Protein backbone atom coordinates (compact mmCIF):
# COMPACT_ATOMS: atom_id res chain seq x y z
CA UNK A 1 0.00 0.00 0.00
CA UNK A 2 1.33 3.43 -0.95
CA UNK A 3 2.24 5.85 1.83
CA UNK A 4 -0.32 8.65 2.03
CA UNK A 5 1.32 12.03 2.51
CA UNK A 6 -0.21 15.12 4.06
CA UNK A 7 0.23 17.04 0.81
CA UNK A 8 -1.93 14.47 -1.00
CA UNK A 9 -4.68 14.81 1.59
CA UNK A 10 -4.47 18.58 1.33
CA UNK A 11 -4.76 18.44 -2.46
CA UNK A 12 -7.74 16.06 -2.41
CA UNK A 13 -9.51 18.06 0.28
CA UNK A 14 -9.09 21.25 -1.73
CA UNK A 15 -10.30 19.56 -4.90
CA UNK A 16 -13.30 17.77 -3.38
CA UNK A 17 -14.35 19.85 -0.39
CA UNK A 18 -14.26 16.67 1.72
CA UNK A 19 -13.09 16.60 5.33
CA UNK A 20 -9.54 15.60 6.20
CA UNK A 21 -10.37 12.10 7.41
CA UNK A 22 -12.69 11.40 4.46
CA UNK A 23 -9.94 12.53 2.09
CA UNK A 24 -7.37 10.33 3.81
CA UNK A 25 -9.72 7.32 3.75
CA UNK A 26 -10.36 7.81 0.03
CA UNK A 27 -6.64 7.96 -0.72
CA UNK A 28 -5.99 4.82 1.31
CA UNK A 29 -8.81 2.99 -0.50
CA UNK A 30 -7.43 4.05 -3.89
CA UNK A 31 -3.76 3.38 -3.03
CA UNK A 32 -2.87 7.05 -3.38
CA UNK A 33 -4.35 7.56 -6.87
CA UNK A 34 -5.86 11.07 -6.86
CA UNK A 35 -8.40 10.50 -9.65
CA UNK A 36 -9.60 7.21 -8.15
CA UNK A 37 -9.84 8.84 -4.73
CA UNK A 38 -12.03 11.57 -6.21
CA UNK A 39 -14.27 8.92 -7.78
CA UNK A 40 -14.43 7.13 -4.41
CA UNK A 41 -15.66 10.29 -2.69
CA UNK A 42 -18.23 10.89 -5.41
CA UNK A 43 -19.52 7.33 -5.14
CA UNK A 44 -19.97 7.86 -1.41
CA UNK A 45 -21.82 11.10 -2.04
CA UNK A 46 -19.09 13.10 -0.29
CA UNK A 47 -17.89 15.07 -3.32
CA UNK A 48 -19.36 16.27 -6.58
CA UNK A 49 -17.58 16.33 -9.93
CA UNK A 50 -14.49 18.50 -9.83
CA UNK A 51 -14.57 21.74 -11.76
CA UNK A 52 -11.61 23.15 -13.57
CA UNK A 53 -11.62 26.13 -11.21
CA UNK A 54 -10.86 23.84 -8.26
CA UNK A 55 -7.25 23.81 -9.37
CA UNK A 56 -6.63 27.56 -9.57
CA UNK A 57 -3.54 28.73 -7.71
CA UNK A 58 -1.29 31.30 -9.50
CA UNK A 59 -1.15 35.08 -9.79
CA UNK A 60 -1.49 37.28 -12.84
CA UNK A 61 -4.17 38.54 -15.21
CA UNK A 62 -5.84 37.59 -18.49
CA UNK A 63 -6.90 39.91 -21.29
CA UNK A 64 -8.61 39.85 -24.69
CA UNK A 65 -7.90 41.90 -27.81
CA UNK A 66 -10.03 41.98 -30.96
CA UNK A 67 -8.50 42.92 -34.30
CA UNK A 68 -11.07 42.64 -37.09
CA UNK A 69 -11.94 38.97 -37.57
CA UNK A 70 -9.16 37.89 -35.21
CA UNK A 71 -9.18 37.86 -31.41
CA UNK A 72 -6.59 36.79 -28.87
CA UNK A 73 -7.06 35.72 -25.26
CA UNK A 74 -3.87 35.83 -23.19
CA UNK A 75 -2.72 34.91 -19.68
CA UNK A 76 0.30 36.66 -18.17
CA UNK A 77 1.63 35.42 -14.83
CA UNK A 78 3.47 37.07 -11.95
CA UNK A 79 4.60 35.81 -8.56
CA UNK A 80 2.23 37.97 -6.48
CA UNK A 81 -1.11 39.70 -6.91
CA UNK A 82 0.60 42.95 -5.88
CA UNK A 83 2.68 42.95 -9.07
CA UNK A 84 -0.29 41.77 -11.15
CA UNK A 85 -2.12 44.92 -10.04
CA UNK A 86 0.80 47.22 -10.93
CA UNK A 87 0.76 49.53 -13.94
CA UNK A 88 3.92 48.07 -15.57
CA UNK A 89 2.35 44.59 -15.50
CA UNK A 90 -1.02 45.75 -16.83
CA UNK A 91 0.61 47.84 -19.55
CA UNK A 92 2.67 44.83 -20.63
CA UNK A 93 -0.42 42.62 -20.70
CA UNK A 94 -2.26 45.06 -22.99
CA UNK A 95 0.76 45.22 -25.29
CA UNK A 96 1.23 41.44 -25.39
CA UNK A 97 -2.44 40.79 -26.13
CA UNK A 98 -2.57 43.40 -28.90
CA UNK A 99 0.60 42.10 -30.56
CA UNK A 100 -0.58 38.50 -30.43
CA UNK A 101 -3.92 39.43 -32.04
CA UNK A 102 -2.03 41.24 -34.81
CA UNK A 103 0.77 38.74 -35.43
CA UNK A 104 -1.09 35.47 -34.74
CA UNK A 105 1.88 33.39 -33.53
CA UNK A 106 1.50 29.61 -33.38
CA UNK A 107 2.87 29.16 -29.86
CA UNK A 108 4.48 30.94 -26.91
CA UNK A 109 7.97 30.56 -28.37
CA UNK A 110 6.91 32.36 -31.56
CA UNK A 111 5.09 35.02 -29.55
CA UNK A 112 8.22 35.83 -27.56
CA UNK A 113 10.06 36.52 -30.83
CA UNK A 114 7.57 39.16 -32.04
CA UNK A 115 9.48 42.35 -32.86
CA UNK A 116 8.92 45.42 -30.65
CA UNK A 117 10.58 48.81 -30.24
CA UNK A 118 12.72 47.28 -27.48
CA UNK A 119 13.82 44.26 -29.52
CA UNK A 120 11.39 41.40 -29.00
CA UNK A 121 8.37 40.71 -26.84
CA UNK A 122 10.61 38.59 -24.65
CA UNK A 123 12.82 41.65 -24.08
CA UNK A 124 9.74 43.61 -22.99
CA UNK A 125 8.84 40.86 -20.54
CA UNK A 126 12.38 40.81 -19.14
CA UNK A 127 12.23 44.60 -18.75
CA UNK A 128 8.99 44.33 -16.76
CA UNK A 129 10.55 41.61 -14.62
CA UNK A 130 13.39 44.01 -13.81
CA UNK A 131 10.99 46.88 -13.04
CA UNK A 132 8.78 44.86 -10.71
CA UNK A 133 11.42 42.65 -9.11
CA UNK A 134 9.36 39.54 -9.87
CA UNK A 135 9.43 36.99 -12.63
CA UNK A 136 6.80 37.81 -15.24
CA UNK A 137 5.93 35.17 -17.82
CA UNK A 138 3.63 34.65 -20.79
CA UNK A 139 1.86 31.46 -19.83
CA UNK A 140 -0.58 30.81 -22.68
CA UNK A 141 -2.76 32.34 -25.36
CA UNK A 142 -5.32 31.34 -27.96
CA UNK A 143 -5.91 33.08 -31.28
CA UNK A 144 -9.51 32.81 -32.51
CA UNK A 145 -10.77 33.60 -36.01
CA UNK A 146 -14.32 34.39 -37.08
CA UNK A 147 -16.21 34.85 -40.34
CA UNK A 148 -17.62 38.19 -41.49
CA UNK A 149 -21.14 37.28 -40.38
CA UNK A 150 -20.06 36.22 -36.90
CA UNK A 151 -19.75 38.20 -33.67
CA UNK A 152 -17.08 38.14 -30.99
CA UNK A 153 -18.15 38.40 -27.36
CA UNK A 154 -15.47 39.26 -24.80
CA UNK A 155 -15.83 39.55 -21.05
CA UNK A 156 -13.32 40.10 -18.22
CA UNK A 157 -14.27 39.32 -14.63
CA UNK A 158 -12.53 40.80 -11.58
CA UNK A 159 -10.25 42.90 -13.72
CA UNK A 160 -8.95 39.91 -15.63
CA UNK A 161 -8.91 37.05 -13.14
CA UNK A 162 -11.30 35.34 -15.56
CA UNK A 163 -11.55 36.02 -19.29
CA UNK A 164 -14.13 34.56 -21.67
CA UNK A 165 -14.28 34.82 -25.46
CA UNK A 166 -17.14 33.48 -27.58
CA UNK A 167 -18.03 33.39 -31.26
CA UNK A 168 -21.67 33.48 -32.36
CA UNK A 169 -23.01 33.10 -35.87
CA UNK A 170 -25.67 35.62 -36.83
CA UNK A 171 -26.28 37.31 -33.47
CA UNK A 172 -25.07 40.81 -32.59
CA UNK A 173 -22.14 41.83 -30.38
CA UNK A 174 -24.35 42.52 -27.35
CA UNK A 175 -25.72 38.97 -27.43
CA UNK A 176 -22.21 37.58 -27.81
CA UNK A 177 -21.04 39.60 -24.80
CA UNK A 178 -23.96 38.25 -22.74
CA UNK A 179 -22.88 34.70 -23.58
CA UNK A 180 -19.26 35.53 -22.74
CA UNK A 181 -20.44 36.80 -19.35
CA UNK A 182 -22.29 33.51 -18.84
CA UNK A 183 -19.20 31.49 -19.77
CA UNK A 184 -17.09 33.49 -17.30
CA UNK A 185 -19.61 32.97 -14.50
CA UNK A 186 -20.72 29.35 -15.04
CA UNK A 187 -17.59 27.75 -16.53
CA UNK A 188 -18.98 25.19 -19.01
CA UNK A 189 -16.70 22.35 -20.10
CA UNK A 190 -18.23 21.63 -23.51
CA UNK A 191 -20.27 23.40 -26.17
CA UNK A 192 -22.87 20.63 -26.65
CA UNK A 193 -23.49 17.07 -25.50
CA UNK A 194 -22.08 15.84 -28.80
CA UNK A 195 -18.70 17.17 -27.68
CA UNK A 196 -18.59 14.91 -24.61
CA UNK A 197 -16.55 11.77 -25.31
CA UNK A 198 -18.05 8.30 -24.91
CA UNK A 199 -15.30 7.55 -22.41
CA UNK A 200 -16.40 10.49 -20.25
CA UNK A 201 -20.06 9.44 -20.52
CA UNK A 202 -19.25 5.87 -19.50
CA UNK A 203 -17.14 7.10 -16.60
CA UNK A 204 -19.84 9.42 -15.24
CA UNK A 205 -22.54 6.79 -15.75
CA UNK A 206 -20.51 4.29 -13.69
CA UNK A 207 -20.03 6.84 -10.91
CA UNK A 208 -23.74 7.67 -10.79
CA UNK A 209 -24.66 3.98 -10.76
CA UNK A 210 -22.37 3.24 -7.83
CA UNK A 211 -23.66 6.31 -5.99
CA UNK A 212 -27.29 5.26 -6.58
CA UNK A 213 -26.66 1.68 -5.42
CA UNK A 214 -24.94 3.00 -2.30
CA UNK A 215 -28.10 4.97 -1.53
CA UNK A 216 -30.04 1.70 -1.39
CA UNK A 217 -32.37 2.44 -4.30
CA UNK A 218 -34.31 -0.57 -5.72
CA UNK A 219 -32.20 -2.17 -8.45
CA UNK A 220 -35.05 -2.17 -10.96
CA UNK A 221 -35.14 1.65 -11.02
CA UNK A 222 -31.40 2.26 -10.70
CA UNK A 223 -30.79 2.62 -14.45
CA UNK A 224 -33.60 5.17 -14.79
CA UNK A 225 -32.24 7.20 -11.88
CA UNK A 226 -28.73 7.03 -13.32
CA UNK A 227 -29.85 8.32 -16.72
CA UNK A 228 -31.72 11.15 -15.02
CA UNK A 229 -28.64 12.13 -13.05
CA UNK A 230 -26.44 11.87 -16.12
CA UNK A 231 -28.85 14.08 -18.06
CA UNK A 232 -28.77 16.69 -15.30
CA UNK A 233 -24.98 16.51 -15.15
CA UNK A 234 -24.70 17.10 -18.90
CA UNK A 235 -27.02 20.09 -18.68
CA UNK A 236 -24.64 21.55 -16.11
CA UNK A 237 -21.40 21.12 -18.08
CA UNK A 238 -22.57 21.83 -21.66
CA UNK A 239 -22.94 25.49 -22.61
CA UNK A 240 -25.89 24.99 -24.96
CA UNK A 241 -27.97 23.26 -22.27
CA UNK A 242 -27.07 25.43 -19.28
CA UNK A 243 -29.69 27.76 -17.81
CA UNK A 244 -28.80 31.23 -19.07
CA UNK A 245 -27.30 33.21 -16.21
CA UNK A 246 -29.38 36.34 -16.95
CA UNK A 247 -32.65 34.45 -17.49
CA UNK A 248 -32.91 30.96 -15.99
CA UNK A 249 -36.22 30.34 -17.80
CA UNK A 250 -34.28 29.61 -20.98
CA UNK A 251 -31.09 27.80 -21.89
CA UNK A 252 -28.11 29.56 -23.45
CA UNK A 253 -28.92 27.95 -26.80
CA UNK A 254 -32.53 29.17 -26.60
CA UNK A 255 -31.37 32.68 -25.72
CA UNK A 256 -28.97 32.82 -28.67
CA UNK A 257 -31.62 31.40 -31.02
CA UNK A 258 -34.06 34.10 -29.88
CA UNK A 259 -31.50 36.63 -31.15
CA UNK A 260 -31.27 34.81 -34.50
CA UNK A 261 -27.86 33.43 -33.62
CA UNK A 262 -26.03 30.16 -33.22
CA UNK A 263 -23.27 29.10 -30.84
CA UNK A 264 -19.97 28.47 -32.63
CA UNK A 265 -17.16 28.41 -30.07
CA UNK A 266 -16.04 29.57 -26.65
CA UNK A 267 -12.88 29.70 -24.59
CA UNK A 268 -12.43 30.61 -20.94
CA UNK A 269 -9.24 31.37 -19.05
CA UNK A 270 -9.02 31.52 -15.28
CA UNK A 271 -5.70 32.82 -14.03
CA UNK A 272 -3.55 30.04 -12.62
CA UNK A 273 -5.71 27.17 -13.86
CA UNK A 274 -3.84 23.94 -13.28
CA UNK A 275 -0.96 25.45 -11.30
CA UNK A 276 -0.66 24.45 -7.65
CA UNK A 277 0.62 27.03 -5.19
CA UNK A 278 2.31 26.11 -1.92
CA UNK A 279 0.01 26.39 1.10
CA UNK A 280 2.24 25.95 4.11
CA UNK A 281 -0.28 26.70 6.84
CA UNK A 282 -2.93 24.40 5.38
CA UNK A 283 -0.37 21.63 4.96
CA UNK A 284 0.58 21.90 8.61
CA UNK A 285 -3.09 21.71 9.58
CA UNK A 286 -3.45 18.47 7.65
CA UNK A 287 -0.28 16.99 9.16
CA UNK A 288 -1.47 17.83 12.66
CA UNK A 289 -4.80 16.08 12.12
CA UNK A 290 -3.25 13.02 10.47
CA UNK A 291 -0.84 12.33 13.32
UniProtKB/Swiss-Prot annotation:
It comes from the Bacteria. Its main location: cytoplasm. Pfam families: EF_TS (PF00889). Residues 80-83 are annotated as: Involved in Mg(2+) ion dislocation from EF-Tu. SUPFAM superfamilies: Elongation factor Ts (EF-Ts), dimerisation domain, UBA-like. InterPro entries: EF-Ts_dimer_sf, Transl_elong_EFTs/EF1B, Transl_elong_EFTs/EF1B_dimer, Transl_elong_Ts_CS, UBA-like_sf. GO terms for cellular component: cytoplasm. Keywords: Cytoplasm, Elongation factor, Protein biosynthesis. It is found in: Cytoplasm. GO terms for molecular function: translation elongation factor activity. Associates with the EF-Tu.GDP complex and induces the exchange of GDP to GTP. It remains bound to the aminoacyl-tRNA.EF-Tu.GTP complex up to the GTP hydrolysis stage on the ribosome. Belongs to the EF-Ts family. NCBIfam families: tsf (TIGR00116). This is Elongation factor Ts. It comes from Limosilactobacillus reuteri (strain DSM 20016) (Lactobacillus reuteri). The lineage of its organism: Bacteria, Bacillati, Bacillota, Bacilli, Lactobacillales. The gene is tsf.
